[in-house]
Amino acid sequence: PRAIDYYELITNNFGSNSTKTYSDKGYELPEVYDLRKVNLNNLKLIKYALHHEDNLDIKFFAPPIEEHVSYSITNFRSDYSENSPHIIVKTKTINSIIGEEDINEISLIKLDIEGAEIPVIYKMLKDKIYPYQIAVEFGDLMNKKFTKTLKFLKLFLFIIFRGYKLANFDRYPNFLFIKKNKFYNI
């Protein structure tokens, strides 16, 4: 989808300073970012769906409004219909990506993965992968179903008991967790 096209735009600006002002309207041109230290070695697009299992073929449902960009595995925007327009994407786990990309440490993981965030975080932490920061949007909380909220609360406690602190919660349902032993003043 559009994320791939946007990444291509960004790569054309690697090594460049920002030349435009940030608009805060949602879509930003690559020229608003300071990309002087960014290159293909430190910002790579991995064309797989992050998941808690490897090598699955998962349906990602198109948003009902074409201007919207986020595809979703839950299809909550179309009453969970299985017949909506979709694409098929192969999955990878964080473990697989870490191994393939030879990653030793994760400073920040940002997850806006439209319905897969809960099992992905469980698997990541159970596998003892502890990023310094976890920024996550819990999209399923938007549907206000009790079972979704309960799953979130269980995960929230799981994250806390794994040594994280909730550091920011200013735009529901976006959360920032920070690993306590990595930062001295929290």
What are these regions (language model features)?
Residues 1-186:
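Phosphate/nucleotide-binding beta-alpha loop and adjacent structural elements of enzyme active sites
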